[in-house]
Amino acid sequence: WNSVSSLICRERPVEPLESELIDWTVCAATRSSLGPNFVRILGYFREDGTDSVSKIEAAMRAKDPVAMVMAAHTLKGEALQFGALRLWGTAEVIEMTARACVEHHDTPDELLELVVGLRSMFEETLAVLEEDASPVVRERHPLGFGRQFG
């Protein structure tokens, strides 16, 4: 692991992840498993995710990789349960890079670009999930070409 963490922290540039925003198969499985509690749990994701993003941003400002690790780990787990692949992957890179920085007594400066884009990625992901979870959106069906939605 030490050789891997060294690569992560010092030798490999951190780049934004280009993956699918939502894995709808995972999201559907979570929705099925949670049933009517899905919307409530998604609300917790909004609250906890916002808190995690704020903690990651504060840790970046303080150049504190230790504080960054737990918040990124929490965000990563919550994102994965909803199939939020891009957010999960970004949180994973932040967590693993911050862990490597802790081991090497280094600052997480190379994470700046990812951390700066994290809040907008979280908000975009959440908006897509909430729109999909909205009963109004799910119940709208097109009536045909050129007709209004029913």
Question: Over which residues does each language-model region extend?
Answer:
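Two-component system phosphorelay core
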Residues: 1-70, 74-150
